[in-house]
Amino acid sequence: METGRLPLKDLSNFQVNKLSILNTRNNIHLLKNSKHVHTTLPSIKSLISPTPVDPYTKQLTPTTPSVFLNNIQQADDKNVVSGGSFTAFKRASEGQLSKKLQIRLQFAYYKYITNQIDSKFKDIKKKHKNSVGGIRYSQYKSKEQKRTVKRRKLLVSNGSYKNPAKFTPTNDRSFPPINNNPIAFQKFHSSIGSPVRLSTASVINDSCTDKSSEAHSHSINNAFNETTLLTTPSSKSYKEKEVLINNKIQTTPMSVKAAKSLISLFTSNRQ
């Protein structure tokens, strides 16, 4: 069954609305003489003592016992006779209910004074935790504590790993002072540490003593011209090329033709 909405007359007969009239000495005679009594809660200001509340203290200042609680305790000591539609009873729940009501009203009045109506209890509690002895803790902080420690950032390169640079082949095939010189070609590979160092030295020595040195020197020049496509960057000046040789950067041929010509040169059977 659906319960309909109670009228205001029935809602006004609840226990909470009767506490202010039922538990006062001055209003006991109203219960016997009159049937219609205004059952309203007392004002908030009457429940709370006029002692000011310090908003910066960690705990709220204790309030003196209000008139409302004193009247409840006095009414509990005496047995009040029921009159009309009201019933007087003595229960422990009445004191607990009135105490909860008082705390809620005190908190509502405190939020109204401090202009914190929209704020919740947790937010107000955090503000009081940050205060020490009525003065905010931030005033006692030293300058060293207020300094923000900057986080050290890891400096990482863009690629995170240094990859060998890819260079496009250039038309500049002159590499001084090695151009068209087999002895300089030997020095170039020996300074850089090429794996073909030993084979080139033996071939060059044999080609210088042999009568058919012209054919071998011609093949060496062709092979050297093919090996100019190196991984080393094509520098604009001669000094930069010389620095690359002194740093002993390992160079390898980029073209397949140069590799094939070197293999055929070193593996060919000379007559």
Swiss-Prot record:
One GO CC term, this protein: nucleus
UniProt keyword annotations, A-Z: Cytoplasm, Nucleus, Repressor, Transcription, Transcription regulation
Coiled-coil residue windows: none
Superkingdom per UniProt: Eukaryota
Keyword Cytoplasm found: yes
Primary location recorded for the protein, binned into one broad class: cytoplasm
Localisation per UniProt entry: Cytoplasm; Nucleus
Pfam families (alphabetical): Whi5
InterPro entries named in the record: TF_Nrm1/Whi5
Family the entry assigns: Belongs to the WHI5/NRM1 family.
Subunit comment: Component of the MBF complex.
Name assigned to this protein: Transcription factor NRM1
Species name: Vanderwaltozyma polyspora (strain ATCC 22028 / DSM 70294 / BCRC 21397 / CBS 2163 / NBRC 10782 / NRRL Y-8283 / UCD 57-17)
